[in-house]
């Protein structure tokens, strides 16, 4: 990734707000983001859809009427695909939908997704979740101070289990551990909130791709 820009990212701390300079992609490639999201969803797909062929349906294989002299069309058994309840031709069978995507593309996609939130002013870094000890009401009080009122969906990334536990009951918050940060969850939510430890994990993951 050749084009890099310096983003000023707000950092929220108990003593107030400051800014952190970060090198992230200057240009966002929507198609690359789509490729990564498509790869993620394909990996999650169960692929259990299954239809029965004419050899698997629960019907006798007996010919339903003689070939000639009935005045009717020629048919074999009643399990043929032409009959209601018969087998399915070329229907889905259980399969694995996952495929490989180059690690470099995945790194670029993650860096671009975070950069897009930074460019929109929707990325917030947090030094400490003061007063949050596992209770939802504690997180709501902190969120109000941070300017998060539930009007926008939030992806909260932190290694602090107590903070994740406090926020997970809220319908407008998606919580992830730092290692679980991914493009799909970033693009499906409107704001990205990370603590500084999660930010460091992210920087190590993209490893120069910005």
Curated annotation (Swiss-Prot):
Post-translational changes noted in the entry: The N-terminus is blocked.
GO cellular component: ribonucleoprotein complex; ribosome
Signal peptide residue numbers: none
Result of altering residue 56 to Q: Restores Ptase activity of hybrid ribosomes to that of pure E.coli ribosomes. Significantly increases binding of a tRNA analog to the P site
Keywords: Ribonucleoprotein, Ribosomal protein, RNA-binding, rRNA-binding
Record GO terms (molecular function): rRNA binding; structural constituent of ribosome
A GO biological process held by the record: translation
Reported function: One of the primary rRNA binding proteins, this protein initially binds near the 5'-end of the 23S rRNA. It is important during the early stages of 50S assembly. It makes multiple contacts with different domains of the 23S rRNA in the assembled 50S subunit and ribosome. Forms part of the polypeptide exit tunnel.
Recorded family membership: Belongs to the universal ribosomal protein uL4 family.
Quaternary assembly: Part of the 50S ribosomal subunit.
Stated name of the protein: Large ribosomal subunit protein uL4
Native source species: Thermus thermophilus (strain ATCC 27634 / DSM 579 / HB8)
Gene coding for it: rplD
């Amino acid at each position: 990734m050749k084009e890099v820009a310096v983003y000023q990212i707000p950092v929220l701390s108990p003593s107030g707000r400051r800014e952190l300079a970060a090198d992230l992609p200057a240009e966002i490639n929507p198609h690359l983001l789509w490729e990564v999201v498509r790869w993620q969803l394909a990996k999650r797909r169960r692929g259990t859809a299954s239809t029965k062929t004419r050899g698997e349906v629960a019907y006798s294989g007996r010919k339903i009427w003689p070939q000639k002299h009935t005045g009717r069309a020629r048919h074999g058994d009643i399990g043929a695909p032409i009959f209601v309840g018969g087998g399915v031709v070329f229907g889905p069978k259980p399969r694995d939908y996952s495929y490989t995507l180059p690690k470099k593309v995945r790194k670029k996609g993650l860096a671009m997704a975070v950069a897009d939130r930074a460019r929109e002013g929707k990325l917030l870094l947090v030094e400490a979740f003061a007063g949050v000890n596992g209770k939802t009401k504690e997180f709501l009080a902190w969120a109000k101070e941070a300017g998060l009122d539930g009007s926008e969906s939030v992806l909260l990334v932190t290694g602090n289990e107590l903070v994740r536990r406090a926020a997970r009951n809220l319908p407008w918050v998606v919580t992830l551990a730092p290692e679980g940060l991914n493009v799909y969850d970033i693009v499906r939510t409107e704001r990205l909130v990370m603590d500084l430890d999660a930010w460091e994990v992210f920087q190590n993951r993209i490893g120069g791709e910005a």
